[in-house]
């Protein structure tokens, strides 16, 4: 399992929010596939297998969603994959929202439709506004 660090509102594993797409691709390396998340997407995203990276219309990184084959630590504590109760202890304002758990203050979203976290998203400030 990969082990990455995240800094809420700043970035994940060396990828900073606001970083140009070309730099993100260098930092994460490897193969990627460009895709549109849905018909409302304003830009394409990059699928690196272990994560998806989302971009603003001007190709700046605005969010990174990481999947369960990667361990994410924040301030030296594992935040993902852990159960929702453990995540709530680390993120005080984590609120349930249609199968996801969202922290608007930290721009963090945990996708857990069946109660078990499947992915965690870190976004730039205001991502969930």
Q: Predicted segment positions?
A:
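Short helix/turn-capping signatures at newly exposed starts of structured segments
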Residues: 1-129
